[in-house]
Structures are given as structure tokens and as C-alpha cells.
Amino acid sequence: MSGLSGPPARRGPFPLALLLLFLLGPRLVLAISFHLPINSRKCLREEIHKDLLVTGAYEISDQSGGAGGLRSHLKITDSAGHILYSKEDATKGKFAFTTEDYDMFEVCFESKGTGRIPDQLVILDMKHGVEAKNYEEIAKVEKLKPLEVELRRLEDLSESIVNDFAYMKKREEEMRDTNESTNTRVLYFSIFSMFCLIGLATWQVFYLRRFFKAKKLIE
């Protein structure tokens, strides 16, 4: 029995529309929250590309009611220990800086006090790159229409993706060069070891031959 046949089904524009909606729509950024016990230190680390704007907002709740001299300290550093942002008695605020190189950045919260004090609740919302740009402010300054703002956002996002791929390609080339260099060194070391073993074996043969001749065990 032959089944009914008809024209092949055509895919609608839903996937493309969904992709455009994801790219053009506001990006969802979730804040990080954690509890900070008294006299403790917690740090968050993140790798960020060079020449990127990094912004953040933080809030540290104080449930001690001012008891125990509770103080909180926020410090942001790079891998070399350079301080990019520091705030004593931090409770709530914002920070911003621009990265000079691809690096590992560390955001540290430290709590100091005395007595039995409840843990502090720390909320951190950190953005970088396209997420950190204030497109509403850009639209006001440059007098852009809503569609132009979304196109600007898409352009920046596309540029960010291209830069990410370029960096990944560069890292892949560096890793390949490192592997080739390591393989070459291993090959040279293996050849050197082989010659050393051959030389040692030859020396042992001549040494044993002279020893046995001295003992008159062989002619």
C-alpha cells in the first residue's frame, strides 16, 4: 500500500526569528549572592579579555545592627596584584574599570568584627563587554532611534563574538606551537638518551674485556 505524498514541508522563519530575538533582546544577567561569615574572606575569579569595560554593583547586608564593630572590605585585583578597585566599610555601591590585557581578575570580600554576629549577605552583579554598556545613555547622547540602538547592540555583540573566536584561534595556534616544541624536545632527548646508553654499553664491554684479560680469564 502506498501512502499519500505531498509537497515537502517548508520550515518557517521561527528559528531565525528566535535567534534574532535572543540577540536583539535584553540579555539576562543574574546576580551572584552568597553569605560571608564574620572574620572571613571570599573571592570570585573570572578571566576577561583586554580592552573591555567592566562594571559592577554590590550590596552587603548588615544584620548585626552595628554591633561588634562589623566592617566589610571590597578589593578587586588582577593576577599581578594591582588594585583596580578598593573600598573600606563597603555596604553598597558601584565600580567600573577597563581591562588593559587578557587576565584573571579577582573580586574579594572580607568581613572583620567581634562577637557572635550573623553572616552577611553579599549580592554582586558584574558585567563586562557588551553587557556593561549603557545603551540607553548612548541613545540619548547620539540621539538614536530604538531600532538603531538595537542594531548598535547587535553590532557590538557580533564584534565581541568575532574577538572571542580570534582569541580562541590564537590560543589554539599557541597550544599547537607548544605541542610541536615539546615533541621536538622529547625527540632530541630520546636520541640523546639512546646515544648515552650506547656509549655506556660500549664502555662496559671494553671495561669488562680488560678486566677479564687482567684476570687471565680470556685471551
Swiss-Prot record:
Membrane topology, as annotated: Single-pass type I membrane protein
Note: Ectopic expression of TMED10 alone does not result in its proper cis-Golgi network localization. Interaction of TMED10 with TMED2 is both necessary and sufficient for transport of the couple to the cis-Golgi network, and TMED3 and/or TMED9 contribute to facilitating the process.
Positions of post-translational Dimethylated arginine modification: 171, 176
Residues listed as glycosylation sites in the UniProt record: 179
GO terms classed as biological process: COPI coating of Golgi vesicle; COPI-coated vesicle budding; COPII vesicle coating; cytosol to ERGIC protein transport; endoplasmic reticulum to Golgi vesicle-mediated transport; Golgi organization; intracellular protein transport; positive regulation of interleukin-1 production
Short sequence motif named COPI vesicle coat-binding, residue ranges: 211-219
Pfam families per record: EMP24_GP25L
Role played: Cargo receptor involved in protein vesicular trafficking and quality control in the endoplasmic reticulum (ER) and Golgi. The p24 protein family is a group of transmembrane proteins that bind coat protein complex I/COPI and coat protein complex II/COPII involved in vesicular trafficking between the membranes. Acts at the lumenal side for incorporation of secretory cargo molecules into transport vesicles and involved in vesicle coat formation at the cytoplasmic side.
Record bears the keyword Transmembrane helix: yes
The name this protein goes by in its record: Transmembrane emp24 domain-containing protein 10
Species the sequence originates in: Homo sapiens
A GO cellular component annotation in the UniProt record: membrane
Region listing for Required for interaction with STX17, in residue ranges: 1-142
Transmembrane segments: 186-206
Cytoplasmic-side positions: 207-219
Annotated signal peptide: 1-31
Keyword Oxidoreductase recorded: no
Disulfide bridge partners, by residue number: none
Subunit composition and interactions: Predominantly dimeric and to a lesser extent monomeric in the ER. Monomer and dimer in ERGIC and cis-Golgi network. Forms homooligomer (via GOLD domain); the assembly is promoted by direct binding with leaderless cargos and may form a protein channel that facilitates cargo entry into the ERGIC. Forms heterooligomeric complexes with other members of the p24 family such as TMED2, TMED7 and TMED9.
Domain called GOLD: residue spans: 41-193
GO molecular function: protein transmembrane transporter activity; syntaxin binding
